[in-house]
Swiss-Prot record:
This is Pantothenate synthetase. One of its GO terms (molecular function) is ATP binding. The active site is at 37 (proton donor). Catalyzes the condensation of pantoate with beta-alanine in an ATP-dependent reaction via a pantoyl-adenylate intermediate. One of its GO terms (biological process) is pantothenate biosynthetic process.
Length: 282
């Protein structure tokens, strides 16, 4: 595995790979890698001749009162996970390397960002789309891999790639969970022991809602109220949202049918956790 820290060297490598016709699987991350990331890397390894992993904590996607400064970082751990999962190139640029001067151009994304985290975190997805435009141009991927834990991000990226005719296939990968159901996340390290126990109720609330849908409930308001009430009863967290939309358009539905997403965000004392399920309802 080769570690690359400059845009110029990474572009030179991927230009040569592209010219030789090799397929490139790209996994963009903010580091502090866990089993969810490892799953993305293994899928990229299975489906491509070359695997590129980027580790970059992107300041553009953090709001003024968010956790940019304390976001967990451990490049030694990330290197080990990368090596264990068959990465060929680890792209590890500094902020100064990615943004040598103030951006004069950013990518604004609309519609799919009007709800869920996009509504709660203004500017977040513009930051995500901007850094991905840069990373896609630097790494020239055939396929790019994203976890469905942030299903809104996947929907936004799919729309952005389609709208700009970017020649990359977006590959969504199912959420990876702990044995007790908690969605794996780099931010889980912020949870206290009690909060870690309470956080299990996030996924449980989604499973209960899924059972109600499978039993025939088709009123989205009843489903989302069920989820909110369950979380508020079983945790000390604050529900940021518990919403149900068509997926991937993220538009309102009057009836639970077709492909839908039920997504939640809950704030604990030091961390905000997200989770979701997607279903196809007949």
């Amino acid at each position: 595995m080769k570690i690359v820290t400059t845009v110029q060297e990474m572009q030179q490598i991927t230009n040569e790979l592209h010219a030789s016709g090799k397929s490139i699987g790209f996994v963009p991350t903010m580091g502090y890698l866990h089993e969810g990331h490892a799953t993305l890397l293994r899928k990229a390894r299975e489906e491509n001749e070359i695997v590129v992993l980027s580790v970059f904590v992107n300041p553009l996607q953090f709001g003024p009162n968010e956790d940019l400064d304390r976001y967990p970082r451990d490049i030694d751990r990330d290197e080990n996970v990368a090596k264990e999962n068959g990465v060929d190139y680890l792209f590890y640029p500094s902020v100064e390397e990615m943004y040598p001067s103030e951006q004069t151009t950013t990518v604004e994304v609309v519609k799919r960002t009007d709800v869920l985290c996009g509504k709660q975190r203004p500017g977040h997805f513009a930051g995500v789309a901007t850094v991905l435009m840069k990373l896609f141009n630097i790494t020239l991927p055939t396929r790019a891999y994203f976890g469905m834990k942030d299903a809104q991000q996947v929907a936004v990226i799919e729309g952005f790639v389609t709208d700009f005719n970017i020649p990359v296939t977006i590959v969504p990968v199912d959420i990876v969970r702990e044995e007790d159901g908690l969605a794996k996340s780099s931010r889980n390290v912020y949870l206290s022991q009690d909060e870690r126990e309470e956080a299990l109720h996030l996924y449980r609330s989604l499973c209960i809602a899924k059972e109600r849908i499978e039993a025939g409930e088709r009123n989205p308001e009843i489903i989302t109220n069920l989820v909110k009430e369950y979380i508020e009863t079983h945790t000390k967290g604050t529900v940021d949202y518990a919403d149900l939309y068509a997926y991937p358009s993220l538009t309102m539905v009057e009836k639970v049918e077709g492909r839908i997403i039920l997504a939640i965000a809950v704030k604990f004392e030091n961390v905000r956790l997200i989770d979701n399920i997607t279903l196809t309802v007949k």
